[in-house]
From Swiss-Prot:
Organism: JC polyomavirus
Basic residues bias: start-end ranges: 334-344
Region (D1): 273-308
Pfam family, one: Polyoma_coat2
GO biological process, one term: viral penetration into host nucleus
Protein name: Minor capsid protein VP2
Residue segments, region DNA-binding: 313-344
GO cellular component assignments: host cell; host cell endoplasmic reticulum membrane; host cell nucleus; membrane; viral capsid
Length: 344
């Protein structure tokens, strides 16, 4: 076994020197790929340049006879070493492993199909949202972090922020400015109107009531006879008829408005108007805003903060009309028997 290991060491050293001299890898030399490549080059030289001697072709390629011998004899040496080891130890598995060590130096063969289904894929299939299912939100984080280049995060960050700021100034700022101006104008108008209503002086005016009373009294005194006929009768009898007022004397010969006012006698005196409402100040000296109770719904309506309790106070509770229910007809049949007379 020691001799086999010594031969293995010499073989590895020789193949390594040949690989360093030619540029081929150890795996290519052991597998025979390097020898096949050299044979193709020698054949091409013989075809193109007419070189028939192998030594001249090897010299033209730039190889020495020793190196050429090592490259062409390496696959056989590996096979012979495997046979020697198998003969000495009786372990064919070790020879197979040694052959694979040189033959498959850079190429790995998957053994999945040897133990599972032969037509199985060599790579597991994962859906696009596989990692997002395992870690929710990781895809969104990865997609967003690509906007900042880790290698040049400074210029990328500056470019991204400046572009976002420019988009805001160009697209969103005019709309936001107009909305803000509209909102502030509306708020200023409502605030000014509310302050005006709070600080102004209010007075009780009964002119509409006096006018309504005058019109009501006028129409209540009208005669069912047409006014033209009433005037004709009054002129014939020498009396004065007033539609809505009673005169103590004629006002046709009055000299001034004061005299007309003195002669005019109204049965329903006017209600005095012009009484000012005293404005109350908030107690405590904090100069808080205050308003009378009858003005509170108006102010709250301007600010848009009318509460349901205030609506119920102003409009009254919403009373639902109960449905009038008549006597329900009994679904059960009366099984009471009539009282029979004892007479036959």
């Amino acid at each position: 076994m020691g001799a086999a290991l010594a031969l293995l060491g010499d073989l590895v050293a020789t193949v390594s020197e040949a690989a360093a001299a030619t540029g081929f890898s150890v795996a290519e030399i052991a597998a025979g790929e390097a020898a096949a490549t050299i044979e193709v080059e020698i054949a091409s030289l013989a075809t193109v340049e007419g070189i028939t001697s192998t030594s001249e072709a090897i010299a033209a390629i730039g190889l020495t006879p020793e190196t050429y011998a090592v490259i062409t004899g390496a696959p056989g040496a590996v096979a012979g070493f495997a046979a020697l080891v198998q003969t000495v130890t009786g372990g064919s598995a070790i020879a197979q492993l040694g052959y694979r060590f040189f033959a498959d130096w850079d190429h790995k063969v998957s053994t999945v199909g040897l133990f599972q289904q032969p037509a199985m894929a060599l790579q597991l299939f994962n859906p696009e949202d596989y990692y997002d299912i395992l870690f929710p939100g990781v895809n969104a984080f990865v997609n967003n972090i690509h906007y900042l280049d880790p290698r040049h995060w400074g210029p990328s960050l500056f470019s991204t922020i400046s572009q976002a700021f420019w988009n805001l100034v160009r697209d969103d700022l005019p709309a936001l400015t107009s909305q803000e101006i509209q909102r502030r104008t509306q708020k200023l108008f409502v605030e000014s109107l509310a302050r005006f209503l709070e600080e102004t002086t209010w007075a009780i005016v009964n002119s509409p009531a006096n006018l309504y009373n005058y019109i009501s009294d006028y129409y209540s005194r009208l005669s069912p006879v047409r006014p033209s006929m009433v005037r004709q009768v009054a002129q014939r009898e020498g009396t004065y008829i007033s539609f809505g007022h009673s005169y103590t004397q004629s006002i046709d010969d009055a000299d001034s408005i004061q005299e007309v006012t003195q002669r005019l006698d109204l049965k329903t005196p006017n209600v005095q108007s012009g009484e000012f409402i005293e404005r109350s100040i908030a107690p405590g000296g904090a100069n808080q805003r205050s308003a009378p109770q009858w003005m509170l719904p108006l102010l709250l309506g301007l600010y848009g903060t009318v509460t349901p309790a205030l609506e119920a106070y102003e409009d009254g509770p919403n009373k639902k009309k109960r449905r009038k229910e008549g006597p329900r007809a009994s679904s059960k049949t009366s099984y009471k028997r009539r009282s029979r007379s004892s007479r036959s």
